[in-house]
Amino acid sequence: MPSPTPRFKIPESVLVVIHTPALEVLLIRRADPGEHWQSVTGSKDAPDEPLAQTAAREVLEETGVDCGVGSALAGALRPWGLINVYDIYPAWAHRYAPGVTRNTEHLFSLCVPAQVPVRLNPREHTAHRWLPHHAAADTCFSPSNAEAILLLPQFVP
């Protein structure tokens, strides 16, 4: 029996800045060693997966917050029409096919009620906190995540 073909991550992903109407931003700490605080991120599961579906799936998987079709928060997920293209961190390069060095990230935001319950997947994240958006931007390890958080006021109705 042949060995299964390794499944590599698709180098197209979403970044979802989850926030309250008062611009308190949810950050989650990665389970990797170090203090890697971030917003929700994740890659497409299939090349043809719609980006909004990727965003809703990742929000649910990483925080337990349901913003998928038919949920109470479905209309609160907003695509920004902005992308970041960045070099994949060397520590995570093995997750991608050989020769893949850059990722395209699509930005979204999700406005949630204050104190919405958060349920982390402990294999991926170990803690969460809500911070004012400037403090959240200062806390992120990723420059593109910090920049997105600073842009948040421009995308809040």
Feature-to-residue mapping (PLM):
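Conserved N-terminal beta-strand and adjoining loop/helix that marks the start
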Residues: 2-25, 47
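Short connector loops at helix/strand junctions that flank enzyme active sites
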Residues: 11, 39, 101-105
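Short, hydrophobic/aromatic-rich beta-strand segments within well-structured domains
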Residues: 17, 25-28, 106-110
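NUDIX/MutT-family hydrolases
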Residues: 105-149
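Short secondary-structure boundary/capping segments
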Residues: 6-8, 17, 98-100, 119-121
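C-terminal alpha-helix
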Residues: 151-155
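Conserved Nudix-box catalytic region and its N-terminal flanking loop in Nudix hydrolases
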Residues: 20-68, 73-74
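Active-site-adjacent beta-strand/loop module that shapes the phosphate/pyrophosphate-binding cleft
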Residues: 78-117
